[in-house]
């Protein structure tokens, strides 16, 4: 989903004569501390696919958390998320940026981002109107400011 949203944002900015650049490319990768953890994550993705799209879903769902079951309060509070972005400019300069925040990314952090998006939509007078928009294009800097003020960090990092 992230790739599609980023590409949609790029297309909207292109149409608005405010392009990401003609050579814009977005790739999404996962990083794991070991081969074992990468295999476990891959197994999780395979199981998720089976749950969603095969006749086995009825069998597999009996062993998964039920709707409304989620992590306990301690897990929600002690979780965190981090994303690392490699950006290469047209002149070849490479920089790295990261986003990170506290709270379980599947529950607390997502709820925080959704609430900040809703508040931005309700109170900002700087928003673009019309059509099917992405949060980057439709909510833009007002949302970014709210996310930063709510504790989510966006920063340039040194990465080798």
Where do the protein language model's features map onto the residues?
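C-terminal catalytic/substrate-binding lobe primarily of soluble NAD(P)-dependent oxidoreductases
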Residues: 1-160
